[in-house]
Amino acid sequence: MIQRVVRRATARRYGRIERYGANARAVQNEQLEYLLAAGRLTAFGRERSFGGIRSYDEFRRRVDVADYAGFAEYVERARRGERGVLWPGRVRWFAKSSGTTGRRSKYIPVTAEGVALNHMRGMRDVVTMATRIFPKADLFAGRMLTLGGSHSIEREGDAAEVGDLSAILIEHTPRMARLFRRPSRKVALTADFNRKVEALCRECATQNITALAGVPSWNLVMLTRLLEYTGRDNISQVWPNLQLFVHGGTDFRPYREVFRRMIPSQGMNYMETYNASEGFFAMADREGADDMLLMLDYGTFYEFLPTNCLADYEKAIPLAEVECGVEYAMIISNCNGLWRYMIGDTVEFTSVAPYRIRITGRTQSYINVFGEELVVDNAERAVEAACRATGAGVVEYTVAPVYMGGYHTQGAHQWLVEFRTMPDSVERWCEVLDEELRRCNSDYDAKRQGSATLLAPVVTILPRGTFMRQMATEGRLGGQNKVPRLRCDRELADALLNLK
């Protein structure tokens, strides 16, 4: 009943999304015009003469591509309460993010327009899309459980409020939506992640949960604890009406088999989204697809820089010029006051009519110490293949170089892996991992020829809970915190081995 009402109420919006393919250029031009009009009222815009910008070419000439370091000074001014720095008016909210590859915390501005036009529109569109992709799923017969971050809102004097993005969005969730959401606000905003999970189990174990949302790794922790708490064999016995997991934040491929075993219901569905502290960008629009539709009218103007020329920002191109099969670093300008901001994610287009993407990794997450140029997408594919071939299930993993021989001329990749389900054969798991890496990465394959430079992967199995213990020591439990998959150094690997 409610599902049918929602479908009718969102029909017009769904029609607009369907027309993305035909109207992409016009929609993106509208976003840029809107952003520039707002930017003219800011200190950032006045310094770059936004008032004189009449075209995209002029915009790119006057605004340099930058990462967080290039915006940090402006963000600090806004956090101190200065108005109109990056976006008109005062910015009250800041999403605290430690990122994936950096250790220093970032404070991403979250404006009122960013909440309304970006994050909340994205959440509504997930519902719009889910009711079309999974028409048989009765999602509104129960509650959606959202597992957010571990940072509650902290007030910084009278100027700013800082917290995990999920905590900020809870503060802005419409009253009607709260009726369908679990856990309670008190539990959701619990700062300690382990206490949050315990409270969530007590509160939600007997409720009618029909959908989950959040990061796969942290939901896996929660679901594992829920099984211990209830004494059940699988989640379908706890929540028999569970039909959808809306996931994002990390690649789902390494977790797919674990979730299928944990939730054996034939009616279970999975939907990927791409949202971060910086904004909401994409979501799946087809059942079973491994790509996502890029959302074009979220107050975001997109640009893309081929990853083979990351140091040459002049090679950045608008959406209209992208090609399928090329890996790009994504650059955004949006209504949170970010201007030509390189968010650190890399994507590949699978379609340009409409524009669909796959997340392939991070601009700073790779291993290239022997010329192998291993990227996250290669690693995720290989782990998925190895798990599928051996019946294994992975909780977390990370990869670091290990050197052998004199002068560091020969070495290997050390894979530190925490399994939920051990493979039938660890030796076979390693073989398939190596075979898949060689199949999908010609540079890796060349370095593996005859093991002259790169030896076979060295797999180190870590005890259950090792990654969580390490994340806890860093104060990074829950939310959008992620384990770096690939590192060119051994800092994380050695820290994990010391815990072991």
Identify the residue ranges that each predicted region occupies.
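Active-site glycine/GP-rich loop and adjacent strand/helix microenvironment
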Residues: 1-51, 59-63, 74, 81, ...
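Active-site diphosphate/adenylate-binding microenvironment
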Residues: 26, 30-94, 105-110, 117, ...
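ATP phosphate-binding P-loop of adenylate-forming
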Residues: 91-102, 459
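Short small-residue beta-strand/loop micro-motif enriched in glycine and branched aliphatics
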Residues: 103-108, 366-369
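Short coil/turn connectors at secondary-structure junctions
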Residues: 104, 140-142, 241-242, 268
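Long, hydrophobic, well-ordered secondary-structure blocks that form the structural core
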Residues: 109, 113-119, 245-246, 269
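Conserved AMP-binding loop of ANL adenylate-forming enzymes
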Residues: 128-178
